[in-house]
C-alpha cells in the first residue's frame, strides 16, 4: 500500500529510489493504524521495567508515543525520544504532554544508529564534543530504552555498541525486543523455519525494515561489559518471540575531560 500511495496519491514515483524514506513511510503507516493496539500488551515485565526508569532517559524509536504512558514523569529529569519517522512526531509530542512531560521531553528526528543519533544529540545540546561523543566511554544517559526497535535499525551491532557508549557507567538499559527463535535451546524449529519463510516473501520491506531473524541478545552481550545481564525469552514457541529484561553497564572511572563537556 505504501508504494501505491507514493505513486498514485502523492504522485512522486521518484521517491521510490529513496528506500530509507519509503521504509519510514511504510512503518509510519503501519504504526498509525496499529500502534495503540500493539502497545496495550507487552511480554514479561516490560511495563514494570519502563515504569522504573529515572534520571536522564533516551527512548529509541518511540513511534507516536503510545508507550510513553508507561514512564513515570515524576522520576524522569529529561526524556529524549529518538524517532526517525517525522510524520509520527505530532502524536509523539501530544502523548508526551498528555502523560505529564512538558519542557523535559525532547523529540529527536533521528534513528538509533550512531551516524544519525549522535548529530541529533549534539544539535539538541546533550553532547558537546563534535565527532567524539559516539565512542566516549563516560556516557550521557542514566537509562536507555529499546522497545521493539532494534529489529529495524540498519546495523544492529554497531547501533547497540553506540548506545552502550552513551550509557553512563552503572546505567540501565531496558530491553523488550523480538528476535530470532531460539529453537536450538528453548524454541521451536517450525517457528524458526516460518521466520525464514516470512523473510523470503518480503516481511522486512512490507513491515518498514523490521527483521525477524536478529540475535539481539548476543549483540547486546558483545556490546561491552555489564554488571548485570538479565534477559529472558518469552513466547519461544511463536514466530515472534521476545527477549525482555534489564542490563546494567559496568561501573568505571570517569574521563573528567569528557564529563565536563556533557550537558543535560
Locations of regions flagged by a protein language model:
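C-terminal alpha-helical "lid/dimerization" subdomain adjacent to the S-adenosyl-L-methionine
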Residues: 17-18, 24-36, 176-244
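Conserved alpha-helix/loop element of class I SAM-dependent methyltransferases that forms part
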Residues: 33-56, 64-70
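A short acidic, Gly/Pro-enriched loop at the edge of an enzyme's catalytic core
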Residues: 117-144
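A short SAM/SAH-binding and catalytic strip from SAM-dependent methyltransferases
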Residues: 141-156
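A short glycine-rich, Lys/Arg-flanked "PGG" loop and its adjoining helix->strand segment in the class I
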Residues: 157-169
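C-terminal lobe and adjacent flexible extensions of AdoMet/dcAdoMet transferase-like proteins
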Residues: 243-264
Amino acid at each position: 500500500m505504501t508504494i501505491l500511495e507514493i505513486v498514485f496519491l502523492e504522485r512522486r514515483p521518484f521517491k521510490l529510489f529513496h528506500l530509507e524514506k519509503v521504509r519510514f513511510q511504510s512503518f509510519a503507516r503501519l504504526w498509525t493504524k496499529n500502534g495503540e493496539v500493539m502497545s496495550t500488551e507487552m511480554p514479561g515485565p516490560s511495563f514494570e521495567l519502563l515504569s522504573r526508569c529515572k534520571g536522564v532517559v533516551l527512548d529509541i524509536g518511540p513511534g507516536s508515543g503510545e508507550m510513553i504512558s508507561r514512564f513515570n514523569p515524576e522520576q524522569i529529569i529529561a526524556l529524549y525520544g529518538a524517532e526517525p519517522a517525522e510524520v509520527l512526531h505530532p502524536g509523539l509530542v501530544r502523548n508526551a504532554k498528555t502523560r505529564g512531560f512538558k519542557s523535559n521531553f525532547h523529540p529527536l528526528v533521528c534513528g538509533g544508529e550512531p551516524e544519525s543519533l549522535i548529530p541529533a544529540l549534539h544539535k539538541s545540546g546533550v553532547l558537546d564534543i563534535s565527532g567524539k561523543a559516539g565512542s566516549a566511554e563516560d556516557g550521557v544517559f542514566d537509562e536507555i530504552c529499546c522497545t521493539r526497535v532494534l529489529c529495524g535499525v540498519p546495523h544492529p551491532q554497531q547501533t547497540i555498541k553506540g548506545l552502550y557508549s552513551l550509557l553512563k557507567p552503572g546505567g540501565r538499559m531496558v530491553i523488550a525486543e523480538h528476535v530470532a527463535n531460539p529453537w536450538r535451546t528453548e524454541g521451536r524449529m517450525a517457528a524458526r523455519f516460518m521466520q525464514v519463510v516470512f523473510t523470503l516473501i518480503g516481511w522486512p520491506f512490507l513491515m518498514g525494515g523490521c527483521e525477524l531473524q536478529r540475535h539481539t541478545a548476543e549483540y547486546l552481550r558483545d556490546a561491552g561489559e555489564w554488571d548485570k545481564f538479565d534477559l529472558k525469552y518469552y513466547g519461544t514457541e511463536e514466530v515472534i518471540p521476545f527477549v525482555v529484561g534489564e542490563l546494567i553497564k559496568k561501573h568505571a572511572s570517569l574521563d573528567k575531560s569528557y564529563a565536563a563537556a556533557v550537558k543535560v
